[in-house]
């Protein structure tokens, strides 16, 4: 059983790695936000511009969002193209000027021109990219994000979901279900947020294809979300909101993780409450008393399990350095780590440095 489970997780890890190599990740960070103040500064000059005119409350705009968000990363190397958007609730005069009467409206502004051409095709990333390629003379293909959602089957369900070392969120979906399609891009982001957490799994099961398994877990509508924590493999219904922030807050609370919606560790990550109280005593004590408090920290760390045990070892290292180098050590080390975090480093390295920085802050 252990060998089978090891093989399954190995296959999942290899598949994720392969996807990461083959495809460029998707990000919405490079969509240029246009306003009444900057529209004509950004558009109509040395770049062709694809502009989405939208309203925050518009359902069709929300449906378009995950498709539109694929464009900026794909066109990142096409220096002659700008991917942008305008909030027509906030900047009505801009939208009125360019004849926008419904949402979303997507227009192409050629280089050196403020005379747009309206996009009339299907609202998919592929169709939008083809439109930009035709109008802008580029040859770009859509970058596809690697998926961190674990796809379940009857053969893998028990090994993955009932693994007592994992907290597992499962979406039971049907391919034809509209609400499932709307949830899909959000669910992908949830999986990406927690991809570095070894004991958290975000998974899904085609409940239309595997009806017997879905019925076993009382699935009667789609999507149905169930959480299988380490301590309750019977499963619990997820009844929270379906925005990214809702899912992230839920997993953080249930699994003891500390991630934000971008997948980065928060300032609370690594903090062990019982050790924090001892650190306060340690910092306030004189040199002789510090040694006695350090011995108590060592004893407390021995009691810790799981990720808390790993954090406890960082507390011990910091305490030793504090004894050797004095009270300025924590402040100086925090500044050094902050400089490193500003550089281009891997997510795993960023996690490592952030954990240490958070723990150091309790000594500063």
UniProtKB/Swiss-Prot annotation:
EC number, as in UniProt: 5.3.4.1
InterPro entries per UniProt: ERp29_C, ERp29_C_sf, PDI, PDI_thioredoxin-like_dom, Thioredoxin-like_sf, Thioredoxin_CS, Thioredoxin_domain
- Which cellular component appears as one GO term in the record? endoplasmic reticulum lumen
Q: Which cysteines are joined by disulfide bonds?
A: 58-61, 177-180
Q: Where is the Thioredoxin domain?
A: 29-137, 139-256
Per the record, the domain of life is Eukaryota
Alphabetically list the UniProt keywords. Disulfide bond, Endoplasmic reticulum, Isomerase, Redox-active center, Repeat, Signal
The main place the protein resides is: endoplasmic reticulum
Residues at the site labelled Contributes to redox potential value: 59-60, 178-179
Any Gene Ontology biological process: protein folding
User: GO molecular function, one example?
Assistant: protein disulfide isomerase activity
Compartments where located: Endoplasmic reticulum lumen
Q: Which CDD domains match?
A: ERp29c, PDI_a_ERp38
Q: Does the keyword Secreted apply?
A: no
Gene3D superfamilies membership: Endoplasmic reticulum resident protein 29, C-terminal domain, Glutaredoxin
Q: Which residues are marked as site: Lowers pKa of C-terminal Cys of first active site? A: 123
* PANTHER family assigned to the protein according to its UniProt record, in alphabetical order: PROTEIN DISULFIDE-ISOMERASE C17H9.14C-RELATED (PTHR45672), PROTEIN DISULFIDE-ISOMERASE LIKE 2-1 (PTHR45672:SF17)
Protein family? Belongs to the protein disulfide isomerase family.
UniProt protein name = Probable protein disulfide-isomerase A6
Q: Which organism is it from?
A: Medicago sativa
């Amino acid at each position: 059983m252990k060998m089978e489970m090891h093989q399954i997780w190995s296959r999942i890890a290899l598949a994720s790695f392969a996807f990461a190599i083959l495809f460029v990740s998707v990000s919405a960070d490079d969509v240029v936000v246009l306003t009444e103040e900057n529209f004509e500064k950004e558009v109509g000059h040395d770049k062709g511009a694809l502009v989405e005119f939208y309203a925050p409350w518009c359902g069709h705009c929300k449906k378009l969002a995950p498709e539109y968000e694929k464009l900026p990363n794909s066109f990142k190397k096409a220096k002659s193209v700008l991917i942008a958007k305008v909030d027509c609730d906030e900047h009505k005069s801009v939208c009125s000027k360019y004849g926008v009467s419904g949402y979303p409206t997507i227009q192409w502004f050629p280089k050196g021109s403020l005379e747009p051409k309206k996009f009339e095709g299907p609202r998919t990333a592929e169709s939008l990219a083809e439109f930009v390629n035709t109008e802008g003379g580029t040859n770009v293909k859509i970058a596809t994000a690697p998926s961190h959602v674990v796809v379940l089957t009857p053969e893998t369900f028990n090994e993955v979901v009932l693994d007592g070392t994992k907290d597992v969120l499962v979406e039971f979906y049907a391919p034809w279900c509209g609400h499932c399609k709307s949830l899909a891009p959000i669910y992908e982001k949830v999986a990406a947020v927690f991809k570095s957490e070894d004991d958290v799994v975000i998974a899904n099961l085609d409940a239309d294809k595997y009806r017997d398994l879905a019925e076993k877990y009382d699935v009667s509508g789609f999507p149905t979300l169930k959480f299988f924590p380490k301590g309750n493999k019977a499963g619990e219904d997820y009844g929270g909101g379906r925005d990214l922030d809702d899912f992230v807050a839920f997993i953080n609370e249930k699994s003891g993780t500390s991630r934000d919606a971008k997948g980065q560790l928060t300032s609370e990550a690594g903090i062990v409450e019982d050790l924090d109280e001892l650190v306060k005593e340690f910092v306030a004590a004189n040199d002789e008393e510090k040694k006695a408090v350090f011995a108590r920290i060592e004893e407390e760390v021995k009691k810790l399990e799981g990720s808390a045990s790993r954090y406890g070892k960082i507390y011990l290292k910091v305490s030793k350095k504090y004894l050797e180098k004095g009270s300025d050590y924590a402040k100086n080390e925090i500044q050094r780590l902050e400089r490193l975090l500003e550089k281009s480093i891997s997510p795993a390295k960023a996690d490592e440095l952030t954990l240490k920085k958070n723990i150091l802050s309790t000594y500063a």
